[in-house]
Amino acid sequence: MTQETTSLYEDIHALLQEAPGAEQGVFLARLEHTLTDGYARALVLEAERVRLERRMDELTEGLRDDPADAPTDELATIARKLSDADSELSRLRGTLARLRARARAIRSAA
């Protein structure tokens, strides 16, 4: 996980714990900005997944031509990175859903 992603999770968790206070508009703006940052990170992860899947397809296509020359190390690395991206994307989506629900609840209460 990058420092940027760690910082994003810290911001999200702080917003989930923090009381909106008297300045609900300011708080909601921070929530919305953080949601936007989170969605942008999710898009980056999706793009990375697509890139990894394409590379895996290229490598497995080559296996049909010459199975003895299989790039097993690269396939293993790609599989691990793909699994990591899937896990992070799932975690991020869940965390963003909680933040989105919080924003909705604050808007409804206003």
Predicted regions mapped to residue ranges:
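Eukaryotic long, low-complexity intrinsically disordered regulatory regions enriched in serine/proline
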Residues: 1-10
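Residue preference for a single heptad-register face of alpha-helical coiled-coils
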Residues: 16, 23, 30-33, 37, ...
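Extended alpha-helical coiled-coil "stalk/arm" regions
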Residues: 49-75
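Short, charge-rich amphipathic alpha-helices with coiled-coil/heptad character
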Residues: 9-36, 66, 107-110
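Long amphipathic alpha-helical coiled-coil segments
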Residues: 61, 89-110
